[in-house]
Structure formats: C-alpha cells, structure tokens
C-alpha cells in the first residue's frame, strides 16, 4: 500500500497541486488549504519536486496538503491517514528507502544495431559477402576474359588473344596448351583474319605395369626358343 501512497503524494505535489487548486472550487475542495500548500511549495522549494526539500518543509505544509487532498478525495485507497504519513513518505524517498528511478539514467548508447539485426539481414549480408568472394576466386582461377567484337563502316581495329594451359596428373601426366589470336580491321566494310594454333601433348607412364609386361615377354620368348 505504501507504493500506492507514494504515487498519491506525487499527485499532490508541484504542477499536480496547481491543477488541484484550479478545480478546487468546482469540486467543493477546501480552497484555502490547497492555496497555502501551494504557496509553501513555491516559496520554500521554488516549485521543484525535490524530496529532500519536501522532507524539511514545516508541519503546516503537510497539514494543508493533507486537508486539501482529503477534501478533494485524492487519498482514496491509500494508507495515508494523517499529515505525518505524507511527511514520512517524502523523507523515506529522500533517503532512497523507496525505490525510485529516473528516465535520464537510461542511455540509448548502450544499445547497438547488431543486437537487433534480424536473421534475414544477417543471412543476406553473409550471402552477399560469400558471392563476392566466390566470384573473385572463380575469375582468377579460370582466367576467362570477356571480349567484344566491333565492326562497321568506321571500325579501325579489333584484336583478341586467349591463352591457357591445363595440366592433369593421374598415374601419368597430361598437358594441354592453346593459343588464339584474332585481329581485324575495316574502313568501309569489315574484314578479319584469324590464326589459331593448338597443340596437345599427352604422356602416360605406368612404370609398374610396363615393367611387368616386359618380364612376361621375356619369359614367353625363352619358352619359344626352348
């Protein structure tokens, strides 16, 4: 109940007390006690809602505040039954015996964007980075160069060069080399010449199998001689 009483006292202080005074006449409140409590708050605490200042206010302030709130029925369903109860709550709040908090103590800088990154955003970013890395690796590994052909009345020159080599080894060796050169030029029409050459060389060796076959042939030749 003291928790609800604490908020009831807050409603009677500072700006809320001014609103209470404004509707005092319409609600049949005790106008004089509301006015006196408000004046004490302005003169002693400069209108600020400071628990330390409120705790040290004279007893007359709490009496007027209690009478004002009681006549306006603002202390219903609370355990405030006397002016001393109001003072006690203010003083407990001043000594931090009652839990209080300030919005200013919450810093938005403590929260980072990565904490809220959705799974979709994280997956998309990862896929993008993976595709970029894969594309760079593929281009470097295959050595493929895209070229464009040009032709027409005002074309002057066009050339294309492509070379590559592949080496495969599996119980042997295979090497393939290819070169291609294309050149062309035109002034009023289109002409082109191309020269390509390809050579492939494949060498396979099976040391173990060849040696065994050679021994078998020698044995067969000896048998025929006998």
Swiss-Prot record:
Subcellular location, record wording: Cell membrane
UniProt membrane topology term: Lipid-anchor; GPI-anchor
Keyword tags: Cell adhesion, Cell membrane, Glycoprotein, GPI-anchor, Lipoprotein, Membrane, Signal, Virulence
Coiled-coil residue windows: none
Biased composition (Low complexity): 131-148, 161-208
Stretch list, region Disordered: 119-209
Main location: membrane
Domain of life: Eukaryota
Record GO cellular component, one term: side of membrane
Biased composition regions of type Polar residues, renumbered to the chain: 149-160
Biological process (GO), any one: cell adhesion
Lipid attachment points (GPI-anchor amidated serine): 197
Function text: Putative adhesin which is involved in cell adhesion and virulence. Plays a role in Candida-bacterial interactions and subsequent regulation of filamentation.
Protein name: Probable GPI-anchored adhesin-like protein PGA28
Organism: Candida albicans (strain SC5314 / ATCC MYA-2876) (Yeast)
């Amino acid at each position: 109940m003291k928790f609800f009483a604490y908020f009831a006292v807050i409603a009677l202080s500072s700006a809320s007390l001014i609103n209470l005074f404004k509707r005092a006449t319409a609600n049949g409140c005790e106008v004089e006690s509301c006015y006196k409590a408000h004046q004490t708050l302005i003169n002693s605490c400069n209108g600020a809602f400071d628990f330390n200042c409120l705790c040290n206010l004279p007893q007359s302030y709490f009496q007027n505040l209690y009478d004002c709130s009681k006549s306006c029925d603002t202390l219903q369903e609370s355990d405030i039954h006397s002016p001393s109860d109001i003072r006690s709550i203010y003083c407990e709040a001043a000594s931090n015996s009652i839990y209080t908090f300030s919005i200013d103590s919450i810093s938005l800088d403590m929260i980072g964007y990565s904490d809220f990154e959705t799974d979709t955003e994280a997956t998309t970013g990862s896929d993008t980075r993976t595709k970029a890395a894969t594309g760079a690796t593929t281009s470097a590994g295959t050595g493929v160069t895209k070229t464009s052909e040009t032709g027409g009345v005002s074309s002057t020159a066009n050339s294309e060069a492509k070379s590559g080599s592949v080496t495969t080894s599996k119980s042997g060796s295979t090497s393939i080399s290819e070169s291609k050169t294309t050149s062309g030029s035109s002034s009023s029409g289109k002409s082109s010449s191309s020269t390509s050459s390809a050579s492939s060389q494949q060498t396979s060796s099976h040391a173990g199998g060849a040696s065994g076959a050679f021994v078998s042939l020698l044995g067969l030749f000896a048998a025929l001689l006998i």
